[in-house]
Amino acid sequence: MEKKLFGIALLLTTVASVLAADTNAPICLCDEPGVLGRTQIVTTEIKDKIEKAVEAVAQESGVSGRGFSIFSHHPVFRECGKYECRTVRPEHSRCYNFPPFTHFKLECPVSTRDCEPVFGYTVAGEFRVIVQAPRAGFRQCVWQHKCRFGSNSCGYNGRCTQQRSVVRLVTYNLEKDGFLCESFRTCCGCPCRSF
């Protein structure tokens, strides 16, 4: 009996560790090739459903979406409002200028680009649909600051290290038809480190 229980416990631990370390999860947002290699997984029906839900929130709060943040009236979503495309700038997504990265003097060459993620993996490794509702006036953007690999600007005794930061974005729960404010990791800088 004890051997059976031990075997079941070992199996559950293995399954949990495999699920926790999802190999599909990329380093940064917007790097996902899509589930099973598909580049687009958010169907037109889901997009329309999200648009209608965002429009309902905008009408409920009396906010058009083109002025103040649609979700700013709710304290839980206040953190998510700063990544709206109309207000976010590249420096908002940089991390190495702030603690604990101020001690890095050099930065490797960085490729900077903006993106509008439609899905991604949370910091807990859970797959989520990220809210993008352009018709309702709500779009979320992040700026990626990724190392240009192959650069040798750290000198002979260091190497480029990709730093990531956590951003809070509005997601849509399809099962419960509701919004959440969740954390995702995104690339934010590339300091040189000596090893």
Curated annotation (Swiss-Prot):
Alphabetical keyword list: Disulfide bond, Hemolymph clotting, Secreted, Signal
Signal peptide from the UniProt entry: 1-20
Any one GO biological process: hemolymph coagulation
UniProt GO cellular component terms: extracellular region
Main location: secreted
Gene3D superfamilies linked: Cystine-knot cytokines
Tissue: Hemolymph.
Disulphide-bridged cysteine pairs: 28-187, 30-115, 80-181, 85-141, 95-188, 108-160, 147-190, 154-192
Protein family membership: Belongs to the coagulin family.
Purpose of the protein: Coagulogen is a gel-forming protein of hemolymph; it hinders the spread of invaders by immobilizing them.
Other comments on record: The sequence shown is that of coagulogen-1.
Protein name (database record): Coagulogen
Species of provenance: Tachypleus tridentatus
